[in-house]
């Protein structure tokens, strides 16, 4: 029977009650102090001895500000009810009904904090006969600070307490243990005297917590299966039966989800629930999970049709308004958690790897001689095989999610969302312009079957790009180029377009070349007819071959690499002779030499401007003029630069003329001659210097440029200046050999004529 409790104490009567309390303490003859001393002694002897409510109410000497909690009267009322039901037993110790208890109740009414601490300091009071005392738990939880409360809330949400599942007997105890595991707290830790004593977890406790986690995650999983089976599937099937779309489509999307749901909700989850209630006598889970093995075939069927199911959802959403309307209506509900149907369809795929992870953790803590060892090990072997298939499907789903993100970044204009498309690499890069010397910012998306060459566009939210060119992997070739002015460059040559790109570093360049080449190799392995299409890097020409003219986009020679027309060799100027590019070979030509048009296959057969030579080849006409025999000046710069002893830009001055920047080359085929060009791609040299017999002076005067040297012979004086001392020494090393008739590879055939010359060796020594 409930005892009558004193009315709540008002603020106005606090002083009066405090006087009454003082009088009671005075007439008890120091009972307060003695009680406090007894508590200290008892706590020192045994920290785990349960304390009476009176003792706990007097141990706290420092008042604390606590969060809102139930009133002391309410707590006492609940406590009295429990005492009446269980023979006035609290924590296994008889609670004496005496005048001292009445006085304690009065003190509790005056000091709610002490009563709250009383409940908090009694760990066993949280459970009475295996059932949680909710009132006491609420009081104990109020002792923790706001950080612990937030952590507890997060833990509860993680455990799936809002899944809408019916509560089972014993579940509150299991959930509390998992909550303690995640928060790093225990009910005993609430006692101030126990705060400095850390209890190390035993292996048995760790195994129990793993089993508890398995149970709680299984509950959450069953809830998601119910969402797929009982909500999405049923609602869409109802709409299909109205004739909005074929019911067969719905069955293909959800496959055998109903069978999977029935197995987990009617067999596996109840088995785990029962086992956790019997854990004290049967601490094992391996035997239950081993029963899962025959049903993994259901997951194999689901995984096999997963790609097609996701693609079908995408197509139905785009093409069938009724399908889109039903799915969006369900996705707005709270139970969906703001996730799409595709995300929930991934749940069965993710569950098998989850079993594998928990079993691995379980076996690490389990002793090899434990009764559950063999069952757990067999279960892990079977589940690991199924998990490998699920992981593959997960990777595909993640790739599909990434494709959707890129699809949005490209303004939803490129149809790239396809399970067969796989993103290999993406990133910023610079594109070297052919019209000028600037490097333009670009962005590349490399897939397993194509390269998207994109231009950034302005966007207030996120990164947005416009696709400039789509280059297919089929027929693509990669060339590592070397350019002193533009480091870290490489060339991507495809049927649709050829791009000269500049990476941010040598490492970035190597990563791009590796990714591109691996994509090309993988593509040709999938298509055996192209297995011989990949040539070695040294065999890949920088220019389009005659047979490929019009079929493959050429690399455009940059404007600043030539000073004259690459066909007629006339010098360019800004007014009367401007630069034009042949769309077939990429050469820079003048307007006279580019006054032709031809259909180019790589551009869809459209007419494009081409040079005279390409027009004659593509039209099938023979050359109208026989090529004249080339003189020494008509050797192309690119021809000798690619096979030279040394080549670079140098500053050059002859006699009293001003300094000018020229491209200098000493070719391997003619190592005793210095060729001077206006630019690296010129087809005609401006001048040549036979080096044999020249005197080298590498001591510049104060008026000369730094890092300069001179070549003198009779009245001819040629002054050169390099950009660095290292480059200067590189040139001098080759020139000092050439002026004596020697070559870097050994004595030259011209050495026989040196005896007839007036001592060039002596003159060249510096």
UniProtKB/Swiss-Prot annotation:
Question: Sites of the modification Phosphoserine?
Answer: 702, 716
User: Where do the ZnF regions (FYVE-type) fall?
Assistant: 559-619
Q: Does the keyword Transport apply?
A: no
* Chain segments carrying region Disordered: 43-167, 745-766
UniProt xrefs under PROSITE patterns: DH_2 (PS50010), PH_DOMAIN (PS50003), ZF_FYVE (PS50178)
Q: List the expressing tissues.
A: Detected in brain, lung, liver, skeletal muscle, kidney, testis and cultured hippocampal neurons.
Family matches, as Pfam families: FYVE (PF01363), PH (PF00169), RhoGEF (PF00621)
Main localization, broad class:
cytoplasm
Query: Would I find Cell cycle among this entry's keywords?
Result: no
Q: What role does it play?
A: Activates CDC42, a member of the Ras-like family of Rho- and Rac proteins, by exchanging bound GDP for free GTP. Plays a role in regulating the actin cytoskeleton and cell shape. Activates MAPK8.
What is this protein's name?
FYVE, RhoGEF and PH domain-containing protein 4
Species this protein is from: Rattus norvegicus (Rat)
């Amino acid at each position: 029977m409930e005892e009558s409790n004193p009315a709540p104490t008002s603020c106005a009567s606090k002083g009066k009650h405090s006087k009454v309390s003082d009088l009671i303490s005075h007439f008890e003859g120091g009972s307060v102090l003695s009680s406090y001393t007894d508590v200290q002694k008892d706590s020192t002897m045994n920290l785990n001895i349960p304390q009476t409510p009176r003792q706990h109410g007097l141990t706290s000497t420092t008042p604390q500000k606590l969060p809102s909690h139930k009133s002391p009267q309410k707590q006492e009322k609940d406590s009295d009810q429990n005492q009446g039901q269980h023979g006035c037993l609290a924590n296994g110790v008889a609670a004496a009904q005496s005048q001292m208890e009445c006085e304690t109740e009065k003190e509790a009414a005056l000091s709610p904090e002490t009563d709250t601490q009383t409940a908090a300091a009694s760990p066993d009071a949280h459970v009475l006969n295996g059932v949680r005392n909710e009132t006491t738990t609420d009081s104990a939880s109020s002792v923790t600070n706001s950080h612990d409360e937030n952590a507890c809330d997060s833990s509860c949400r993680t455990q799936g307490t809002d899944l809408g599942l019916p509560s089972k007997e014993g579940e509150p105890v299991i959930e509390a243990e998992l909550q303690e595991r995640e928060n790093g707290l225990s009910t005993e830790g609430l006692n101030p005297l126990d705060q400095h004593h850390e209890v190390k977890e035993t292996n048995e406790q760790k195994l129990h917590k793993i089993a508890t986690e398995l149970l709680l995650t299984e509950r959450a999983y069953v809830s998601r299966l119910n969402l797929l089976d009982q909500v999405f599937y049923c609602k869409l099937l109802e709409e299909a039966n109205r004739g909005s779309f074929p019911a067969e489509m719905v069955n293909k999307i959800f496959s055998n989800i109903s069978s999977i749901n029935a197995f987990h909700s009617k067999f596996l989850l109840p088995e785990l629930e029962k086992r956790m209630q019997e854990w004290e006598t049967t601490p094992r889970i391996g035997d239950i999970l081993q029963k899962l093995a025959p049903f993994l075939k259901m997951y194999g069927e689901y995984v096999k049709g997963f790609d097609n199911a996701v693609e079908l959802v995408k197509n139905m959403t785009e093409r069938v308004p009724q399908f889109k309307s039903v799915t969006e209506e369900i996705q707005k509900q709270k139970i969906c958690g703001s996730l799409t149907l595709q995300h929930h369809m991934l749940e069965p795929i993710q569950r098998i790897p989850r079993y594998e992870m928990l079993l691995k953790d379980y076996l690490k803590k389990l002793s090899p001689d434990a009764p559950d060892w063999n069952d757990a090990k067999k279960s892990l072997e079977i589940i690991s095989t199924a998990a490998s298939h699920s992981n593959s499907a997960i990777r595909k789903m993640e790739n599909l999610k990434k494709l959707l993100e890129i699809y949005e970044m490209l303004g939803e204009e490129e149809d790239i969302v396809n399970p067969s498309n796989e993103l290999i690499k993406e990133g910023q890069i610079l594109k070297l312009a052919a019209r000028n010397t600037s490097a333009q910012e670009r962005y590349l998306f490399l897939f397993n079957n194509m390269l998207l060459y994109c231009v950034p566009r302005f966007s207030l939210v996120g990164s947005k790009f416009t696709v400039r060119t789509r280059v297919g992997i089929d027929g693509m070739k990669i060339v590592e180029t070397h350019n002193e002015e533009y480091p870290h460059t490489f060339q991507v040559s495809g049927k649709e377009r050829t791009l000269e790109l500049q990476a941010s570093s040598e490492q970035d360049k190597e990563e791009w070349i590796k990714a591109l080449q691996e994509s090309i190799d993988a593509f040709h392995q999938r298509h055996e007819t192209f297995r011989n299409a990949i040539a070695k890097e040294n065999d890949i020409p920088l220019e389009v071959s005659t047979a490929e003219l019009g079929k493959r986009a050429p690399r455009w020679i940059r404007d600043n690499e030539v000073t004259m027309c690459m066909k007629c060799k006339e010098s360019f100027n800004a007014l009367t002779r401007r630069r034009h590019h042949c769309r077939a070979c990429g050469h820079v030509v003048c307007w006279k030499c580019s006054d032709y048009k031809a259909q180019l296959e790589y551009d869809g057969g459209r007419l494009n401007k081409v040079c005279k030579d390409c027009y004659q080849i593509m039209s099938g006409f023979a050359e109208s003029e026989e090529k004249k025999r080339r003189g020494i000046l008509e050797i192309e710069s690119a021809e000798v630069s690619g096979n030279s002893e040394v080549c670079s830009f140098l500053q050059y001055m002859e006699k009293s003329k001003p300094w000018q920047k020229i491209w200098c080359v000493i070719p391997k085929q003619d190592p005793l001659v210095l060729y001077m060009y206006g630019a690296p791609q010129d087809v005609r040299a401006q001048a040549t210097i036979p080096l044999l017999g020249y005197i080298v002076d590498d001591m510049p005067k104060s008026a000369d440029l730094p890092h300069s040297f001179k070549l003198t012979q009779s009245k001819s004086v040629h002054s050169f200046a390099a950009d660095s001392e290292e480059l200067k020494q590189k040139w001098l090393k080759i020139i000092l050999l050439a002026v004596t008739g020697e070559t870097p590879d050994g004595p030259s055939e011209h050495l026989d004529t040196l005896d007839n010359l007036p001592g060039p060796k002596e003159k060249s020594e510096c």
